[in-house]
Regions:
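Feature captures the catalytic ectodomains and active-site-proximal regions of enzymes
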Residues: 1-260
Length: 260
């Protein structure tokens, strides 16, 4: 199984620009695709935690990267992630950069993101995307049974540059190119599950159901905010995914005979 997370990806950019995003376009043509609406607060840390635990935000209780002025750690999340339930002796699983906490979570892969994974500098974000692409391809060359990776760069770019449509679109082109490389390791004629998704969409401030971040932050003015409508693309996934946690439930069902 291959699971690719693209933090903050939105159909509002992808669909109008399909002709410039050939790999997103191919996924839309050859896979099932739709909007996944996040009914709970569309913040990255709790949503990715739901995706990778199979639990709702209420069930896992993880609210944000920082709670009561304290940076959260893995030990602060009172829940098991799917890779912790799956037996490593039975399933070769490699997990890269799940942004439930900082630093992001990895499993059976050694990796350190550029700038501790929190940079908003465009050059560093570009370096970070390329580094994660290279590590992902290195891991995929090994042919793991379960591979998951999350790319965070679109979220950072969107927050600070949402008012610059061409710049944001250029970063979607970069992400599309990364997808093309990763999908070289997926056989579209096989019965292997493939999931590509985001944790939330993106929009101007005030367009989403709830405001997740203020417009003014210590890092600068934010030009956009999270939207509850996320991207969901699946192939060979015979499971009714209505909420983020359903992704984790599907993963656990798929490997139910290999749980530890």
């Amino acid at each position: 199984m291959i699971l690719i997370g693209v933090d903050a990806a939105t159909w509002d950019i992808i669909k109008p620009h399909r002709d410039e995003l050939p790999n997103f376009s191919r996924l839309m043509e050859e896979c099932d695709h739709r909007t996944l609406t996040v009914d709970e607060k569309p913040k990255s840390a709790p949503v990715w935690t739901s995706i990778f635990t199979g639990l709702s935000q209420e069930e896992h209780g993880h609210r944000d990267f920082i709670v009561d002025d304290e940076l959260q750690k893995r030990s602060d999340i009172d829940a098991e992630f799917v890779w912790e339930k799956i037996d490593d002796d039975k399933v070769d699983q490699r997990i890269l950069q799940v942004p439930a906490v900082y630093p992001q979570l990895n499993h059976n892969v050694d990796y350190e993101p550029v700038g501790y994974g929190v940079t908003s500098d465009l050059d560093e974000l570009d370096e970070d995307m390329e580094k994660l692409r290279e590590k992902s391809l290195e891991v995929l060359e090994d042919g793991p049974d379960f591979f998951a990776v999350v790319f965070m760069q679109l979220d950072k770019v969107s927050h600070f540059y949402w008012d610059d449509e061409e710049l944001v679109l250029d970063w979607y082109r970069k992400m599309d190119d990364v997808l093309g490389d990763l999908l070289e390791h997926y056989d579209f004629d096989s019965d292997e599950p493939l999931i590509v998704l985001s944790d939330h969409g993106f929009a101007e401030h005030g367009e989403g159901r709830v405001q997740t971040l203020p417009e003014e932050t210590p890092a600068g003015e934010l030009k956009g905010d999270h939207h509850e409508d996320a991207v969901l693309i699946t192939k060979n996934v015979d499971y009714d995914i209505e909420d983020p946690e359903d992704v984790g439930k599907f993963v656990l069902e798929h490997y139910e005979e290999q749980l530890s």
